[in-house]
Each structure stands twice: as structure tokens, then as C-alpha cells.
Amino acid sequence: MKNIKYIFRIFGVIGIIMIASFLNKKIQLSSVSESCLTESFNKEFIPLEKLNLNTEYNFSKIFNCTEWDEVFIVQAPYINRAFIYIQSGVLLPEYDYINSSENNHFVFFINNGHIINKPIIFGGPYFLFSNNFNRSNYLKIEKENANFIYKKYEDSYYGMVTLELIEND
């Protein structure tokens, strides 16, 4: 009987810690706004057609107007905020993700574990982000590794393009 009480106490403490962490992130999200990162991203990458094929895009050099340490990319529209939070510790802001096109991705910048910008919608009908998304359809990349090349998608007959992560040696 003592073991059962002990187990319940452990689960209770873990539950309280998880709830406190969730509430802390929820409070941090309330201060998310349009930022210079959003403006810089839109200026550099939208519309997608203005990107040059076979060109490298180093996010740490392009997006230097404010501090950030990770970029978080989520594939639309199948976004489960709770599942992503449990897996990654990143709480996505409330947004109508379901009504987004399947060809869209949402880009977020993270600083000290908190998202610091509103969702940036990125993609198009002939764009595919080909970068080992996990089962939750997200990709989390540290700033120093956020280096991409814009190129034609190799396995496509339809002229699809991709922003492919350049693997660091």
C-alpha cells in the first residue's frame, strides 16, 4: 500500500511540473508578436519564386535582427499542438492550422525555449520541404545548423523545389 501511495505522489509531482511548464510557456506565448524576424523572413523568402536555385541560405546570417537559438518548422495542416508540445517541449501559438494548405509550412524562431514570433507561413504548390520530418511533422534545428540550399527536388517530374538542410560535417 505504501508503494502505491509513493507512486501516486511521484505522478502527482510530475503532473504539477508539467502543468507549471505548460502554463509558463502559455504566458510566454501571450507576448508573441510580429517581429523583425517575420519581416526579414517575408522579405527574403516570399514569394518563393524569387529564390535562386542552388543558392545557400544561412539562417544565422540572414536573421540577425534579434536573438534566437533554434528554428522550428512545422508541416501543415496536420498539426497537433499537444503532441508536439509533449514531444518537443515547444508550445505552438493558437492558430487555425487546419485550414492551411498541405503545401504550407509554419516557421517559428525560438529563444531560450520560447517561440518569439507569430506563425510565418511558407511554401507553395510546387514546394516540398524534404528534411526528415518526424512523425509529428516538425523539424527543430539549432541556429548554427540552420543552413539550407534551395534546389530542384530530385525525385520530381513536376518541377518541385525544396529548401534542403545542408548537413554539417
Residue ranges and their predicted role:
Residues 1-5:
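Positively charged n-region of N-terminal signal peptides that target proteins for export
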Residues 8-9, 14-88:
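N-terminal export/targeting and maturation segments
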Residues 9, 107-110, 149:
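Compositionally biased, low-structure terminal segments
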Residues 15-18, 92, 126-127, 162:
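Polar low-complexity intrinsically disordered regions enriched in Ser/Thr and small residues
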Residues 56-126:
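Mature extracytoplasmic domains of secretory-pathway proteins
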Residues 128-169:
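C-terminal partner/receptor-binding element of secreted or periplasmic proteins
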